[in-house]
Structures are given as C-alpha cells and as structure tokens.
Amino acid sequence: MKNLFKKYNKEKANFFVLGLRYEKPNKAEKYFCTPVGAKVFASMGMGGVHYCTVESFGETIFAVVPDSADGYVFPIAHDLAEFFSLIAELEGTQLLDQIPLFPKNIFENALKDHLAYADEERKAELAKFTKMFGVVAAKTPYETVMDLQNEIDISKIEFSKEYYDVLGIEKD
C-alpha cells in the first residue's frame, strides 16, 4: 500500500466529480471529530467529510463526517487500494460514508439512483481515476464496508479534548 500512497501523493490529483479531493496531510483541515493520530489524505470537498488513516489502526481508511448524527468516524476500507476500488464501484465517494448508516435495501436504492444519473463528465473522471491508479471496482461495496464495521472496535479511537468539549461529555 505504501507504493499506492506514494503514487497518490505524487499525483496530487483531484477528482471533484467523484468527490475525491487531494489533501496534503500536514496541511489538511481537521475538525473536532478528527481522531488523534489521523493522517488526512483526501476530502469530499464539502460538508467537512474527509478520509484518513489513524496511526493506531494501521492502513485502515476512515471517513470522518462532522455533520453526522450517528457517529462521526466510520471505518470504510482495509487500505487505500480497497478505498479506491469502492470509489470505482460506487462512481464516487458520495455514498461511501452512508453505507454504515443504511440498511442494505436503502443503500442499494440510493446507489441505483446515483448510477442512473451518471453523466459524461463523471464517466470521464472515473476512467481517468481507474487508469491512473490501476483500480478494479469492488463487487460488493456494502458487504465490504459492513464487514469492516464488524471487525473494527471504534471505541478504541482516541479523540481530542475539543471533541469532548464540543459534545459536552466527560472523557473516561
């Protein structure tokens, strides 16, 4: 995976239509809910949604969603290659952070609607993305993300003092 991260950091490519904006790790904006030890490498470019690895979780990719009502941090891929394959299958990041929140049938309906509105710009950007990084689309995105949800103990994620202050809760 280090080679894929190296290529990604070298290319610094943005795929705005796919909802993938390159973020320089040492300059990326972090939010109250960004985990301690997070290395932000990309964002959706809206809503504060960003993607990171967390030092204590190895190569696992997390989505951080500051305006979510059902938690703020979701593991979504085992590594960068899987993250990219999910983006390819879903034709963007727009539904990726929603998978943990939706029952499968609702997710599949949302995906069907999303794919039905694919325009030439999105198709061209997706082709460029898959070619640039040698991406093969994931065949079971819902199961991939949900299986990871069951593997990762998110209670082990460490948050900053600001996180607890914003939420008005005491740190254990």
What do these predicted regions represent?
Residues 1-69, 114-172:
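A surface-exposed partner-binding patch
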